[in-house]
UniProtKB/Swiss-Prot annotation:
Catalytic residues as annotated in Swiss-Prot or TrEMBL: S105, H235
Enzyme class, spelled out: transferase
Subcellular location: Mitochondrion
Gene that this polypeptide is encoded by: MCT1
Further facts: Present with 1360 molecules/cell in log phase SD medium.
Catalysed reaction equations from the record: holo-[ACP] + malonyl-CoA = malonyl-[ACP] + CoA
Organism: Saccharomyces cerevisiae (strain ATCC 204508 / S288c) (Baker's yeast)
PANTHER family the UniProt entry points to: MALONYL-COA-ACYL CARRIER PROTEIN TRANSACYLASE, MITOCHONDRIAL
Transit peptide: 1-24
EC number(s) reported in the record: 2.3.1.39
Metabolic or biological pathway, per its Swiss-Prot or TrEMBL entry: Lipid metabolism; fatty acid biosynthesis
Family classification: Belongs to the FabD family.
Protein name (database record): Malonyl CoA-acyl carrier protein transacylase, mitochondrial
Keyword entries, A-Z: Acyltransferase, Fatty acid biosynthesis, Fatty acid metabolism, Lipid biosynthesis, Lipid metabolism, Mitochondrion, Transferase, Transit peptide
Amino acid sequence: MKLLTFPGQGTSISISILKAIIRNKSREFQTILSQNGKESNDLLQYIFQNPSSPGSIAVCSNLFYQLYQILSNPSDPQDQAPKNMTKIDSPDKKDNEQCYLLGHSLGELTCLSVNSLFSLKDLFDIANFRNKLMVTSTEKYLVAHNINRSNKFEMWALSSPRATDLPQEVQKLLNSPNLLSSSQNTISVANANSVKQCVVTGLVDDLESLRTELNLRFPRLRITELTNPYNIPFHNSTVLRPVQEPLYDYIWDILKKNGTHTLMELNHPIIANLDGNISYYIHHALDRFVKCSSRTVQFTMCYDTINSGTPVEIDKSICFGPGNVIYNLIRRNCPQVDTIEYTSLATIDAYHKAAEENKD
């Protein structure tokens, strides 16, 4: 069975790549835009102007998926464009292709949209609302703890080729009572991306105070300071726990608006960032997505599920853009899976050419 993957908020859109795809696949994109309603072209124009916006990234990833659907079924493109993006399908109208879904952080929201729960515009609105909640929660935390706003939150990617389980070892270090003072409790493991790589978040002063100890504990450690334009300590429960209830309520109201709140099963099961478990039911998937918005992304647990934890073996993964971060993670950590990049005109054409040849 196939696994379809979707990237998170850290992957900015290459507008030149996206425009090249749209130019070359103009007929297919016209079908997509017409099927997604009058607001879809406005969303596309917004993406061109705001390629780093969370709403842009989520919508762009969904558009890659819709293009994949059409190109995979060229005999009747009108039927293959997900009409549910404007008018939500009834529960008995499911996609023919059976597959598992996996998104990294924000990408898990795209997984919910692929399950026909809400429109493309809804996806855009939820992604931006989630980001706004995190910004507000961060600002309230700074005020409540009387922290100077010049002390920004940063994100560091840590990698160590000699580590056996770097995320767990870093977490153990953070839990050490003799290492961190009470004022240094803003540091958290945000993403457990592999056994040799993780991302930590925290106030810059707290992170800097830990730099020497990190280098002493982990030989050949590489620290990469990531861009963080919204000053959000992503997946940091100390700061972002308050976002859960309003985010859940916001999504639930959208489901009620669309009449999808009464549905039970997902069209396509989702492997959850929260714990690596597979969500088959909508309320489980929604609950896990909301909780993981303020908890560590346990991607290493997702690899365990992909490699040996699914009822039907996963033998192929289609990794949608923007960007190839998730493609590289799956390729390195799930060696038995045929991992395919679906991020550019060249990779899209290569995939469908190979798929057509295999049919013959």
